[in-house]
């Protein structure tokens, strides 16, 4: 899979921009605050219909403009597909092959991307919500049903929390509707729990040899999925539903008292252990970065296994955060395999040696020029 071209209209600091890309490595060089990250963000948004930098689509629209459009042409092994996203005060519209999609879950997955940025180092040591979002966004690209279920779960959870708040404030005493919402939450949430466990099992298998290689076989990586629903890793869907329902039943009084759902996928945690220790607490910064890098590289292979296509890799100012050894592992792993977009102030000697025939763009105050045109 590759992104052949990108067009931005009134997106961030770009009024009108069209770029054609190499199927290999594309590099955007420039100082900070020139628009490099905006370019990678636009590719991420084109793929996932949301930004990793802001929760408000209004931030994506250029200052004093009323609407913005991102469009691109995606090449797969057997087809080419035009994609576009249009943002306005009426919301966003997603199109595939020029046809508007009724649901974003029908759109996401047309272009698969993996982003590796300095903040992704927080994947290991950041808040649990960072890791839950990581699972949902990465697995959601591979599995449309999972993406749909997470959307449904959030809707039910919001409604259930609102009703718990009403019970807390004694605006109602009727718990029959709470039973209905609990049943819906269990039905959808149990599917999410099983899917997450299966995804993390596969991710662990893919990441372990990569992690061992980067650490020169000195360290062993283990992924631990710690759910607020205490189900066995090999449990059936019906068994998970039963355990989930029992957990909600036991927590009912506490939930009404606090006006919030205390059990479910939204409370789950992912932990990374290295040599049996939680790397977020006991690991060095080097071990934490090795873990994050191994997970990101494992995603590439796992996405290819699950979808039949390699994803597009976005490296946003991350090379400078890695030492020479980790830079080498990263660049060798993607060589001649994955279309890659890199932003950096400059390229290190290592990067220039390992990146074959990159297409280099220079970015200055939102103006982009090809290196061989300068």
Swiss-Prot record:
<dbReference type="GO" id="GO:0006260">
    <property type="term" value="P:DNA replication"/>
</dbReference>
<keyword id="KW-0742">SOS response</keyword>
<protein>
    <recommendedName>
        <fullName>DNA replication and repair protein RecF</fullName>
    </recommendedName>
</protein>
<keyword id="KW-0235">DNA replication</keyword>
<dbReference type="GO" id="GO:0005737">
    <property type="term" value="C:cytoplasm"/>
</dbReference>
<dbReference type="InterPro" id="IPR003395">
    <property type="entry name" value="RecF/RecN/SMC_N"/>
</dbReference>
<keyword id="KW-0963">Cytoplasm</keyword>
<dbReference type="InterPro" id="IPR001238">
    <property type="entry name" value="DNA-binding_RecF"/>
</dbReference>
<dbReference type="InterPro" id="IPR018078">
    <property type="entry name" value="DNA-binding_RecF_CS"/>
</dbReference>
<dbReference type="GO" id="GO:0006302">
    <property type="term" value="P:double-strand break repair"/>
</dbReference>
<feature type="binding site">
    <location>
        <begin position="30"/>
        <end position="37"/>
    </location>
    <ligand>
        <name>ATP</name>
    </ligand>
</feature>
<dbReference type="GO" id="GO:0005524">
    <property type="term" value="F:ATP binding"/>
</dbReference>
<comment type="function">
    <text>The RecF protein is involved in DNA metabolism; it is required for DNA replication and normal SOS inducibility. RecF binds preferentially to single-stranded, linear DNA. It also seems to bind ATP.</text>
</comment>
<comment type="similarity">
    <text>Belongs to the RecF family.</text>
</comment>
<keyword id="KW-0238">DNA-binding</keyword>
<dbReference type="GO" id="GO:0003697">
    <property type="term" value="F:single-stranded DNA binding"/>
</dbReference>
<dbReference type="GO" id="GO:0009432">
    <property type="term" value="P:SOS response"/>
</dbReference>
<keyword id="KW-0227">DNA damage</keyword>
<keyword id="KW-0234">DNA repair</keyword>
<dbReference type="InterPro" id="IPR042174">
    <property type="entry name" value="RecF_2"/>
</dbReference>
<keyword id="KW-0547">Nucleotide-binding</keyword>
<keyword id="KW-0067">ATP-binding</keyword>
<dbReference type="Pfam" id="PF02463">
    <property type="entry name" value="SMC_N"/>
</dbReference>
<dbReference type="GO" id="GO:0000731">
    <property type="term" value="P:DNA synthesis involved in DNA repair"/>
</dbReference>
<dbReference type="InterPro" id="IPR027417">
    <property type="entry name" value="P-loop_NTPase"/>
</dbReference>
């Amino acid at each position: 899979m590759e992104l052949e071209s990108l067009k931005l209209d009134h997106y961030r600091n770009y009024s009108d921009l069209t770029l054609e890309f190499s199927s290999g490595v594309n590099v955007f060089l420039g100082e900070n605050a020139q628009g490099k990250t905006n370019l990678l963000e636009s590719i991420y948004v084109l793929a996932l219909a949301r930004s990793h930098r802001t929760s408000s689509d209004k931030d994506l629209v250029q200052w004093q403009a009323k609407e913005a459009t991102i469009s691109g042409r995606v090449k797969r092994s057997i087809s080419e597909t035009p994609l576009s996203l249009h943002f306005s005060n009426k919301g966003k519209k997603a199109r595939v092959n020029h046809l508007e999609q009724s649901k974003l879950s029908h759109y996401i997955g047309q272009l698969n991307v993996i982003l590796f940025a300095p903040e992704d180092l927080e994947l290991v040591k950041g808040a649990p919500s960072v890791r839950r979002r990581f699972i949902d966004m990465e697995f959601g690209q591979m599995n449309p049903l999972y993406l749909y279920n997470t959307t449904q779960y959030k809707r039910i959870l919001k409604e259930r929390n609102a009703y718990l708040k009403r019970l807390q404030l004694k605006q109602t005493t009727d718990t029959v509707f709470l039973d209905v919402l609990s049943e819906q939450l269990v039905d959808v949430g149990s599917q999410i729990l099983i899917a997450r466990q299966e995804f993390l099992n596969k991710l662990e298998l893919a990441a372990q040899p990569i992690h061992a290689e980067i650490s020169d076989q000195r360290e062993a990586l283990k992924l631990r999925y710690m759910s607020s629903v205490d189900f066995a890793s090999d449990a059936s869907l019906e068994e998970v539903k039963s355990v989930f329902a029992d957990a909600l039943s036991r927590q009912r009084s506490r939930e009404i008292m606090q006006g919030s759902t205390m059990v479910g996928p939204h409370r789950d945690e992912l932990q990374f252990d290295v040599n049996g220790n939680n790397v977020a607490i006991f690991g060095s910064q080097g071990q934490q970065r090795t873990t994050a890098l191994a997970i990101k590289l494992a995603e590439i292979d796992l996405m290819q296994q699950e979808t039949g296509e390699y994803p597009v890799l976005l490296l946003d100012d991350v090379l400078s955060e890695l030492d020479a050894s980790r830079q080498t592992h990263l660049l060798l792993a993607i060589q001649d395999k994955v279309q890659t977009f890199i932003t950096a102030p400059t390229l290190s000697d290592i990067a220039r040696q390992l990146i074959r025939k990159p297409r280099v763009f220079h970015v200055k105050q939102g103006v982009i020029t090809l290196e061989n045109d300068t």
